Every structure is written in C-alpha cells, then in structure tokens.
C-alpha cells in the first residue's frame, strides 16, 4: 500500500509538508518532506528535533513496538484502547461484508490506517492530515458530532463496556468511531465536549477495576494542583451512577484553537525498540535547548518528580510527559496529566531520575540531582516539604472528591510509606 498525505497545522490549515507511506505486510516505512512555502515562512518551526527544517524527504522505518512515522506524527496515532476499538470495528465490518456476500478488500490494518482513523476535530495537537482527494481525514460527517456532549456519557459508557466485554454490536462500534479513537492509553476513554463547549477527555471505569481508579486519578490530579503543580483541570461527573473522570484538554485554546503538542519521547528522539532507559535529566537537557522558559519548567519538572515519588505515580513513562509549542521551535512543559497512585506496584519509576539513581523512587535520588536541575539544595528541600504537606491531606481531599473510606483504603500504601516519612524530616 502506498499513500501520499498532505500535512497541515492549525485551524487555518497551513500546509507544512507531504507524508509518503509505503507498506507491505510488516515492512513499513515513510518519508516526510517540508513544503517550500513552510520552509520560507517567517514563523516556521521544526515539527520535532528529529525533523529539522531542510528541503527533501526525511525517512523513517518502522521498528518493533514502534511506528512507521516520525514521532511528531506517531504522537497523534491511537494506541491501547483506541487501537482496540479500531480493530474491533474493522473486524465487525469484515464480518458484515461477508454476510452480505461481499469479500472485504482489506485484510490487515497497517500503521497508516490507524493514523488516519483519528477524527480531525479531536486529534491531539495541531497536526492535520488530508488524503489524496483533498479531504481532512476523519472530519466530522454531516449531521454527526464526533465529540459528543456530556449528556451522551451514558451512551458512551454503555458502548465502551460492550467493547470491554466483547459483546459490542455494529451500532456500538459505529457510535465510537471517531469518538473513542483519538486518544492514547490503555484505559477506556473518549473525547467529549464539556458544558462550556471546550474539549475534554472522559475516562471511564473499567469492568476489570479492583479499586476506584477514576476517582483515584481525580484525587491525584487535585492533590497535584494543591502541591503547586501545573496540571490539567480534572473533576468527577456521574453517569448512571458510575464515576467518570473529566480531564480538560490542554492542547486547545479557550476558543478551541489547536496548539502543537509533542511527547517527551519525541522531544528526546527515544527509540521504542531499544532497551535503553531514559532519565529526567535528559528532559532537563532538552528543555535547556528547546524550552521557551527552561529554568521555570525545570523547577516544575522537579516538583512533579517529588509528587510522583510521594504518591507512587510510577507509570511516568515518556509519553506521559508532553510539551506545547510556543513560538519558532520553542516549547514549554505541558500541564501534568495521567497522574495516578499505584498502591500495588513496586516503587520504581518508568523514567529514571538519572543514570546514577536508577529507577529508585526516593527522596535521596531527588536530592542527588538538585544541582543538575540548578536548584539550590535549600529550595529543593522546601519544594519537597510543600508537596509532602499537600499529600498528607490525601484522605481529606479524597472525601472532597466524593470517595468513601472503603474506596480510599486500597490506595493507602501509595500515600503512606517510608519516603513520606523521610520527606517530613528533610
């Protein structure tokens, strides 16, 4: 399969370049070339450090566990839950075609199919893809909202539960098409329109949950805000008696405009097929090169590390850190998101603090890199103290969120542990 896709940026649809895809079975590759008008624009910027502003094609080959595209494009691909919905929808359509006596054309979906299955209106960041017919991929169909209002949460929840339990109908999948396929992550979720008309992410409880996960995430996000972190706005809403975490999208302006976004994995050029570990100190280095306000973002990153250590937020991989474009290739740290307490997990960070500390989620590891972050030791200790005092109120904050003692208790070991005691003595 060969495809040629035009790449645009923003609501004004400015042409950035052309993406060429060539795939046969598991052998997939792509090439991106900036358009000469973009290269000549006064406000041009590289979509990522791995795609410098040069003329001509820049190639990328798919690697195991990776994408066929450069990181800037791969960051907008569906994975986890969204990929599952797309695969189930594809299988259901093939079944229906056979029942109608038609042999389906497509047997296996390729990376390009997933990239273009994301709805244009709710795709993460500001990149937009236009097919060979000049149509923006997965644009809103006439008379159909791809990002539904909150009033439809019940319908969304019913459809996602059907997919989870493998009892979905063609109607369930048709409803989720474009609605439940624009976001990454493993848990069931969907883009929705909040009461004020802005985009948000609705995160649903899973049928496999053994604790109140959605409530726990909102608790963590609100604790993070109380600890001085810049975080995505989060609250709980009720849908037919079930708690849905509603997270405000930060890649949109107040009036709905798109903001370019990239993950820390893309900023660092991380190879998903490699066994190499990555470190917060690498993010510090990247901010010093590419950041618009590097030192304030570096201190913010330090505060986030302290918070993660104190609440056992150990799913802090590079795709759970992001950046928003400001101007001419300068980026700022995006608000914190996907923060969760994990009481059942070993206290080891996915992103190591530094090569020397390893995965240890400890106060000692934090303090050992204070000078690398250019934070005075006294200031580093003060930040740890501020965060610890906020985390100490986790039960009260949980009650404010609406959690019962029975719902809070399974989270206790994520908040009450030796590092909290050490933080109090710092």
Regions picked out by a protein language model, each given a short descriptive name:
Residues 1-318, 322-426:
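Phosphate/dinucleotide-binding and metal-coordinating scaffold of catalytic cores
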């Amino acid at each position: 399969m060969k495809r040629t896709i035009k790449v645009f940026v923003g609501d004004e649809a400015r042409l950035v370049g052309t993406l060429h895809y060539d795939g046969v079975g598991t052998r997939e590759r792509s090439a991106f070339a900036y358009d000469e008008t973009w290269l000549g624009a006064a406000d041009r910027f590289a979509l990522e450090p791995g795609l410098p502003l040069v003329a001509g094609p820049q190639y990328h080959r798919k690697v195991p566990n990776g994408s066929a595209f450069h990181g800037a494009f791969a960051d907008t691909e569906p994975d986890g839950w969204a990929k599952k919905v797309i695969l189930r929808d594809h299988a259901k359509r093939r079944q229906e075609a056979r029942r109608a006596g038609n042999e389906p054309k497509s047997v296996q979906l390729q990376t390009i199919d997933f990239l273009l299955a994301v709805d244009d209106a709710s795709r993460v960041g500001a990149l937009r893809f236009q097919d060979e017919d000049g149509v923006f991929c997965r644009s809103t169909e006439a008379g159909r909202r791809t990002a539904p209002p909150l009033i439809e949460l019940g319908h969304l929840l019913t459809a996602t539960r059907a997919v989870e339990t493998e009892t979905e109908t063609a109607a369930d999948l048709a409803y989720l098409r474009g609605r439940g396929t624009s976001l990454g992550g493993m848990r069931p979720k969907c883009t929705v329109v909040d009461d004020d008309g802005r985009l948000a992410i609705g995160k649903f409880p899973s049928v496999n949950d053994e604790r109140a996960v959605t409530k726990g995430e909102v608790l963590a996000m609100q604790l993070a805000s109380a600890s001085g972190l810049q975080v995505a706005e989060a609250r709980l809403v009720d849908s037919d008696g079930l708690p849905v975490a509603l997270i405000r999208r930060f890649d949109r302006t107040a009036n709905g405009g798109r903001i370019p976004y990239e993950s820390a994995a893309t900023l660092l050029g991380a190879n998903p097929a490699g066994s190499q570990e990555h470190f917060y100190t690498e993010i510090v280095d990247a901010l010093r090169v590419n950041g618009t306000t590097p030192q304030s973002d570096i201190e913010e990153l330090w505060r986030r590390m302290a918070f993660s250590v104190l609440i056992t937020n150990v799913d802090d991989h590079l795709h759970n850190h992001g950046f928003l474009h400001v101007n001419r290739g300068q980026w700022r740290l995006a608000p914190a998101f996907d923060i969760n307490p994990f009481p059942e997990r070993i206290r080891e960070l996915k992103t190591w603090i530094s090569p020397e500390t390893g995965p240890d989620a400890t106060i000692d590891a934090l303090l050992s890199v204070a000078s690398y972050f250019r934070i005075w030791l006294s200031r580093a200790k003060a930040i740890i103290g501020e965060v610890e005092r906020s985390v100490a109120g986790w039960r009260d904050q949980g009650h404010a969120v609406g959690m019962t003692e029975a719902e809070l208790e399974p989270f206790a070991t994520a908040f009450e542990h030796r590092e909290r005691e050490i933080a109090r003595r710092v």
